[in-house]
């Protein structure tokens, strides 16, 4: 048994892009509120100058803050992103030193203190993202 990602002869995923999305579902009725392709092939081994694709394969989950921000890395392009929970608009992204195929966490040192979002940037061998061994913290404004 092999646990590998199946690629086409062009070394791309077999299904058409986008290959990964961040989707918000209204749990009261099951409808999709918004669906945004997650990541870009521009800085990955999938890059093709003739066709930059939004929505890379991804592995990792989001966190949601009380202020309505959705933080997720997961994509193959080594960015941690923040999205608006109501609209799906990408509000911010920060470059990671390696793949962020992990679920971020958030914390405060004091109840009235600054909030931080932290993610392990270790990469993922099967996805072909850059490997590393960093913990990266971003302070929320």
Residue spans for each PLM region:
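A fold-level detector for beta-propeller and closely related beta-sheet-rich head/sensor domains
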Residues: 1-141
